[in-house]
């Protein structure tokens, strides 16, 4: 973090990750002292500098939410982002069975908040849009991504929506009252059925009225009616698998 020391603006409070040519740390701005915490990603490998500096410059022009700018130093550069407090995403949903309506709101926050990832390049999006970077702020009803950007992270085709689909799977308990519309939507997300976060969020909003009606109907149905519905669903899936 020599660049931070040289600029005299940030103080390192905790190192989060470090390997050859890369270091990420939590920092405070000593010139303001307003309590805001930042994640600073420093790249000192010439390979990383050549590959990434232009991408971060483009991100800065896009005014990516939470991006506070670049710090350049002799032999390195750093990208500074606002840090969001919260419970790590996987930990939050592992410890809570979850209220459906609460999780529905968090899912909307997740999908709405990640529209900006469509605006940036695949390399930096692959580093930032990960379950490990996500936190849940239950008091605000929001899901945030803290931009710890390890340059060695990679991703395949349609990784944005596939990763979000995997996170949605973690959020919901698919019991007898779970709407088919949302279950099918998550499956489509995980299989790469959406080309962008924007397309995925648009589809999400479109299914909400019918999903709400379906859930209301399922909450009222008898056990026998549910068992019949489940049997019909199993037969339909079997036929699809066999191409009937």
What are these regions (language model features)?
Residues 108-122:
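Short C-lobe core helix of eukaryotic-like protein kinase catalytic domains
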Residues 121-239:
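C-lobe/activation-segment region of protein kinase-like
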Residues 66-78:
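Short beta-strand micro-motifs within the conserved protein kinase catalytic domain, predominantly
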Residues 84-94:
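Structural motif in protein kinase domains
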Residues 43-47, 86-87, 150-153, 173-174:
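Short acidic, S/G/P-rich loop/turn micro-motifs used as interaction or catalytic elements
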